[in-house]
Amino acid sequence: MEEASGSAGNDRVRNLQSEVEGVKNIMTQNVERILSRGENLDHLRNKTEDLEATSEHFKTTSQKVARKFWWKNVKMIVIICVIVLIIVILIILFATGTIPT
């Protein structure tokens, strides 16, 4: 009878050891996943910082380009207005006879 209870006790111990080993493996996998996730988060944070710096540079550059083309446009408008004004003055002067033809 002692052998039967001893054998049953050994089976229970083996079952418990097997369960403990299974839990140990699961916990090891969980820790590895957590570490991997931490590494991925660090990588993602670095990419985010790089994108932020790049976006600031892009914003500054695009503002400079927009300002440059705005001034170019203003200069062109002023030149066209001056040319039109000169043509109108010449037409008026020819029409009034101030400038002989």
Curated annotation (Swiss-Prot):
Localization per Swiss-Prot or TrEMBL: Lysosome membrane; Late endosome membrane; Early endosome membrane; Cell membrane
Residues in the Vesicular compartment per record: 97-101
SUPFAM superfamilies: SNARE fusion complex (SSF58038)
A biological process from GO: autophagosome maturation
Modified residues (Phosphothreonine): T28, T48, T54
Residue span(s) of domain v-SNARE coiled-coil homology: 12-72
Cytoplasmic side: 1-75
Oligomer and partners: Forms a SNARE complex composed of VAMP8, SNAP29 and STX17 involved in fusion of autophagosome with lysosome. Found in a number of SNARE complexes with NAPA, SNAP23, SNAP25, STX1A, STX4, STX7, STX8 and VTI1B. Interacts with PICALM. SNARE complex formation and binding by PICALM are mutually exclusive processes for VAMP8. Interacts with SBF2/MTMR13. Interacts with RAB21 (in GTP-bound form) in response to starvation; the interaction probably regulates VAMP8 endolysosomal trafficking. Interacts with STX17; this interaction is increased in the absence of TMEM39A. Interacts with TRIM6.
Protein's name according to its UniProt entry: Vesicle-associated membrane protein 8
Organism: Mus musculus (Mouse)
Upper taxonomic lineage: Eukaryota, Metazoa, Chordata, Craniata, Vertebrata
